[in-house]
Structures are given as C-alpha cells and as structure tokens.
C-alpha cells in the first residue's frame, strides 16, 4: 500500500537538492545516505528526484556528481544543475527553480542523513494543512568536534532564542512553494553576513511558518578543522531583519512541562498508509474548529524536544542501529558513534544577549539617523567633544529628532543633564559586561546593523572600535563611520596606546570614512603612523563655549599687579587626577615655587577617573601646600575663574584640550606643557606660555614669574588668546565641518 494517494503518485512528489562545490570525495557518503533515504520513500510509493547543484564545483566534485547519473544508482531520476554564483543562497534558490516536486528537501554536500529522515518528513508534510518546515530531530556533529544538538519546534521557543542562536540546521524539507515564496537572501561571502540559513529561519519564523523536527531522525554534520561553512561563518553576522516582526511571531511565553516526541512505529506507518485517505480528512475535521494557533499549541505540547538524556553508556538499540548504518556509509563517524552516550549536548541557553539586544534597539529606534557613541558623558575634554557633535547633529534639519547618544560604559560616570536638548540618550545596561568579549563585540555590531544609522561618530568609544575589528566590513557597508583620536595614552615607560592602534591588523580602517581629531599635530602623527591619506584624517577644531561671552576685563587676571603672601598669585589646575595629566608635576612645581619664596597658591579641581592611587596622591598634594577643591561639573564655566590669575596644564599627552580654549575665552591666561595639539592654540608668548614638557619644572616656574611680573604682557596675552579662540573655535565653522560628515 502506498504512502500517497494514487492520483498524485504519477508525478514527482519530492525533490532532494544536494548543494556542492569543493567536497570532492566527501560528496560520496552524502549521496549514499540520500540514496538510502530515497529508497525508503520508494518502498512507500513516493516518487522522487535528486538534484545535485554544482556551484563553482571543483573537477573532483563534478566528477563524483556525474557518477550518480548512471542508471540504477538511485531509485529516482537524477539531474545535475551547474552554477557559478559562489553563494549557498543562490545554489538553493537555483534548486528551487529547477525542482519539479511538490515538496523539496535540502542537504549540503558533505553532511549525511538517516534513511528515515525524508520518510518522516513526508509523513508530517502530507498531513499539514498549511506551510510547514521540517528538520531532523537531532544533529550529530563529527570530525573536528563531536556533539549532539536536539532540534526544537518553533512553538517551544521565543524570539530571544532565535536572535541568540541559529536553532535549526540548514537541512530542511517543506512544500516547494515555501522556498518559492521565501527564497534565501543572497549574502555574498565577501560581505561578511550570514549564515544565510539563519536569516532564512528568522524570515520564515516571522512569516508564521512552523519549524518542527521529524521524530527519530538524525542528521550528521561534518565539522572541519579548516575551511567549510562552520569556519567561514565564525565572524559572520546577521544583516538587517525585522526584529519587531520576530518578537510578534515568537513572543515570550512560559513553557509547559516538556514532553518527548513519540516515534512513529513501523506498524503505525503501515496503518497510516492504509488509511491515508480516511485519516487525513478526519484529522483535519477534528482540529479545524480549534484554529491554527490552538493546533500549534497542541503540537508544541506533543513535540517538545527537551528529552531526557541517556544515562552514560546506555544507547537504545534503535539509536545504535541508526548510528551503525551511518558509520557504514561514513567510517569517520565511528568514533563519534562509539562515544554517543557521553557526547556533549548543545542546548540553546539564555545568557542575556537577546534581552540586551532587544532593549537597546527599542530604546534607540526612531532616533538613530545619526548616532554619537561614547563610553560616558562627563566633564572631560572628550566629553565636551561628544556633546558638540550631538548638538551639531540634532540642530541639522536632516537629523532633527533622530539623533541619539549611546553610552556603553560605566553609567555612574555619566552626567545626564549635559546631554544636549533634543538628543535621545541611551545607556547600555551594566549586564552587557557580563557577556564574553566575543559576544559584546557581536551584540554591539548587531544593534548597529539592525538600526543602520546614516552617520556614526564614535568619540573614544572603545566598544565600537572592538566591534569594528571583527565586523568592520559589515558595519561600514551600513553606515558612514567616523572615529576620533585626539592623543595617545601612555603605559609603562611611555608606550603609546589607543583602541584604534591597539589592533595589530587595523583592517577596519579601510571601512570607516575618516578619523577625526581636533589638532594638526595629532593629525600629522596619525597619518604618518597609520599610512592614511589626507581624506582619511580630518581636523575639527571644537567649540568650547556656546554662547561665547564677551571678553571680561574685570577679572583678577586682567587687573592685579602686585602679589604678596597675603595676596598671592592664584593658579587653577582643573583636570583629571590621572597619570597622563601629571599631577606629580604639579607637586614638583609647588615645591619649587615654595623653595624660591614666590607668593603663589595652586588650587586643584577634579577627580580621579582611571587611576587608583587616590589616597597617597591626595596626601602628597596636601603636603606640597596645594589646595584641593574637589570635583566639579559643567566645565570651566562652573568654576570661579575670575578669581584666578592663570591656568596650568601639566599633561604628558593631549589632543587639543578644550579647557585651554575655554580658559582663553574666559580671559584666563594659559601656561601649558608643549604636548600634542596644545601648540595648535597656545603660541608661546602670544596666546599663552609654553614649557618644553611636563618635566620642565624650571620652564613652568619661569612662565609663572613672567605673568606675575608683567601685567602688560598678561593683558596682551589675554586679548590675543581671546581673539584667536573665537576665530578658530567658533560654532558656525564647526557646524559646517559636521555637515560634511553626511
């Protein structure tokens, strides 16, 4: 008795497509396993055809495929389809185009199936009233890695599972119309997107098509040490997909008690075949009033895939028979089969990745035509730069209302009121740091690919730089990306470090539009060091105050002429108390001034952010007679600068510190070490006074004495510095530069 009714037995019911390219002799065991599965269907009266799709196939692979054209090799018609697409999606879509069966199955050219796989799939599909996708119930990996992967039904998972893991293997069986209506998206291998079957699984799940495992079937997945799909997709990532649609299709739910899928016994199959014409209409009549959603819930209960694992050393006779059958076809399976009872079971687990992804995307969605990425938004110079870019972008009519700032690091360091009005601020939850570094990089990249901002400006956001190292091609294809590099931090004996240069390959530099810096000195260093063209490094002089105040001539700096111990010359040092700012130099300056009897008092504002020697540093500051005034917010404008006579900067490494620009606009002369981009704005004895570097204690002392002794020079420097800062660091010129980012 046939599995199918007589009226459809004359036409091809099932096409089986095997896709191959460079498998060579490994194609043999695949086709032998497919041939065995076809023979099982032939005994049930199911007419089949075998399509071997050769995509840019090697000569050895092509020769192996052609051997299967010989009559009697397979109990089905055999055709070879050739293509030069070099793409798995195109191969599968080509198979769909040429397939003649009402149903279609796919298998890659180096994997194996059990002889009952196609039979069990057809039993389920012939009973289906609507589109349905069948997979094997268990995937056994062999080769470079051995493991067992139980395949879930779509009714037993939610969107978080499918966002985090590709839950269904590339091998599937469905109505041919399913593959015609939802073809595989073509993802060029060089683009870095994929795997294509994961995207197809997502898209079909969004369409509401159930994915279900065929009971008691196995699929043997060959894992290669080198090459192969599994290695090619190590650094692949999913392209854009409809996340909202997936959430709607696979909502969160509480799972009922898991149940084992009951196998279809041979006797049951005989009964099914014999009563096929009766059983199908009865089954449909009984379940039809329940509706599709209810029928799927019932199926979910029955076909739950969380099954008890066999005790160590115990394998059922049925499984042993299946493994033995497969090993006779492919002996490379033997050691995996021998260890089957003790193999690691891969299970999709919830590590928080998907929940974080959904939360971040939801908070950013609708506000990401332009995106500024930062570690945090605080009071430092880089923080002001990030605020400048966010403000300029949100004021641009092309982006108004669609600009976000995404802070990825320590939330407590962000001062929310500093975020410009109209800018959507999103903080990455601290749980992000509980993910592995690999998953952090992937999640950040996936968020950006789902949102596809037109412009991304990263201001020292190391999380984006880390993602670019692995997903630069993909991110660069979706957005115009700009990174900032203002200066190098120093480690050890002064070795330069920066997230951009820490990556020894730096392949991502070809994928970004440009590196932004705020001074010509750093621009020149970066161009030479990284072998970048002029177009790849852009100098953006940053606004420091908005609005710009008129020059104040009522300050102590502009008017005080004589200084005594009771009326000292007051210096302000408003920086982070971290190593690169060289607070140790400040202590040495204070000791030098005291030893020479100069009536000078130094006031420190700021706090430690990156260093951890706070207590000992504060003791040394106090011992040197320096007055510590505590941390501050709101930039230099928040401090009583009119009470001071000059500002000190002692750093060993800087870009162009905006605190110097602010000081000039507020009428406070600057004494600074000549490092980094400082010389772009501080011209010695014109717009300020320079020392040779942070260790030039004598130079600092002489500069302080010069400003104390000459009120005329002090006033001249104040006026010239103010005019220079307005000309170089105005808001209008900066806005024009930001316009060029788009």
Model-inferred region functions:
Residues 83-99:
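Glycine-rich, basic loop-to-helix element that forms the pyrophosphate-binding segment
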Residues 69-79, 423-429, 614-632:
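Nucleotide-activated donor-binding/catalytic signature segment of Leloir-type glycosyltransferases, i.e.
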Residues 669-672, 682:
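Short hydrophobic beta-strand element within catalytic cores of glycosyltransferases
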Residues 191-200:
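Acidic donor-binding loop at a coil-to-helix junction in glycosyltransferase catalytic cores
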């Amino acid at each position: 008795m046939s599995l199918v009714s007589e009226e459809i037995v004359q036409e091809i019911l099932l096409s089986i497509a095997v896709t191959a390219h460079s498998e060579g002799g490994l194609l043999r065991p695949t086709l032998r396993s497919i041939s065995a599965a076809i023979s099982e269907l032939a005994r049930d009266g199911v007419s089949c055809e075998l399509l071997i799709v050769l995509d840019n196939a090697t000569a050895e692979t092509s020769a192996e495929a052609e051997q299967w054209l010989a009559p009697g090799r397979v109990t089905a018609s055999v055709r070879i389809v050739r293509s030069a697409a070099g793409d798995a999606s195109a191969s599968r879509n080509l198979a769909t185009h040429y397939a003649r069966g009402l149903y279609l199955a796919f298998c890659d050219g180096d994997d194996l199936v059990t002889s009952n796989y196609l039979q069990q799939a057809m039993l389920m599909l012939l009973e289906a009233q609507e589109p349905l996708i069948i997979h094997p119930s268990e995937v056994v990996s062999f080769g470079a890695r051995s493991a067992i992967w139980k395949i879930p039904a779509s009714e037993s998972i939610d969107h978080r599972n499918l966002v985090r893991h590709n839950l269904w293997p590339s091998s599937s069986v469905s109505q041919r119309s399913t593959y015609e209506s939802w073809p595989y998206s073509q993802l060029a291998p060089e683009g870095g997107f994929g795997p294509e079957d994961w995207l197809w699984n997502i898209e079909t799940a969004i369409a509401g098509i159930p994915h279900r495992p065929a009971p008691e079937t196995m699929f043997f997945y060959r894992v290669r040490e080198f090459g192969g799909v599994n290695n090619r997709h190590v650094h692949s990532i999913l392209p854009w997909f409809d996340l909202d649609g997936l959430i709607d299709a696979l909502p969160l739910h509480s799972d009922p008690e898991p149940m084992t899928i009951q196998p279809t016994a041979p006797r049951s199959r005989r009964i099914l075949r014999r009563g096929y014409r009766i059983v199908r209409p009865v089954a449909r009549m009984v379940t039809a009033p329940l509706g599709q959603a209810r029928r799927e819930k019932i199926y979910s209960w029955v076909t739950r895939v969380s099954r008890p694992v066999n005790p160590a050393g115990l394998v059922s006779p049925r499984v042993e028979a299946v493994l033995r059958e497969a090993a006779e076809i492919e002996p490379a399976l033997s050691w995996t089969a021998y260890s089957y009872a003790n193999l690691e079971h891969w299970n999709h687990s919830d590590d928080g990745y998907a929940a974080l992804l959904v939360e971040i995307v939801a908070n950013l969605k609708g506000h990401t035509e332009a995106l500024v990425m930062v570690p945090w938004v605080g009071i430092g110079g880089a923080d002001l730069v990030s605020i400048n870019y966010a403000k300029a972008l949100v004021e641009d009519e092309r982006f108004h209302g669609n600009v976000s700032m995404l802070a990825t690091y320590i939330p407590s360091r962000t001062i929310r009121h500093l975020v410009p009005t109209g800018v959507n601020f999103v903080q990455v939850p601290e749980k992000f740091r509980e993910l592995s570094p690999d998953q952090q990089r992937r999640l950040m990249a996936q968020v950006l690919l789902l949102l596809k901002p037109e412009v991304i400006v990263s201001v020292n956001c190391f999380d984006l730089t880390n993602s670019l190292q692995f997903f630069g091609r993909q991110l660069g294809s979706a957005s115009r990306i700009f990174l900032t590099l203002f200066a190098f931090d120093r480690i050890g004996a002064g070795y330069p470090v920066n997230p951009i240069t820490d990556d020894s390959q730096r392949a991502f530099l070809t994928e970004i539009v440009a590196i932004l810096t705020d001074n010509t000195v750093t621009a020149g260093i970066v161009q030479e060091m990284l072998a970048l063209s002029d177009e790849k490094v852009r100098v953006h002089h940053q606004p420091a105050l908005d609005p710009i105040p008129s020059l104040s001539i009522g300050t102590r700096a502009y008017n005080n002429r004589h200084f005594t111990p009771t009326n000292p010359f007051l210096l302000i040092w408003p920086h982070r108390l971290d190593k690169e700012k060289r607070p140790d130099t400040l202590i040495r300056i204070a000791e030098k001034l005291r030893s020479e009897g100069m009536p000078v008092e130094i006031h420190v504002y700021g706090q430690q952010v990156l260093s951890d020697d706070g207590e000992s540093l504060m003791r040394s500051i106090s011992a040197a007679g320096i007055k510590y005034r505590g941390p501050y917010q709101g930039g230099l404008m928040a401090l009583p600068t009119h009470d001071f006579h000059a500002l000190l900067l002692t750093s060993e490494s800087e870009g162009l510190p905006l605190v110097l620009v602010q000081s000039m606009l507020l009428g406070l002369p600057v004494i600074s070490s000549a490092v980094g981009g400082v010389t772009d704005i501080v011209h010695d004895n014109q717009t300020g006074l320079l020392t040779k570097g942070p260790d030039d204690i004598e130079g600092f002392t002489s500069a302080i004495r010069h400003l104390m002794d000459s009120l005329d020079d002090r006033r001249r420097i104040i006026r010239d510095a103010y005019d220079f800062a307005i000309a170089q660091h105005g808001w209008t010129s900066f806005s024009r530069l930001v316009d060029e980012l788009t």
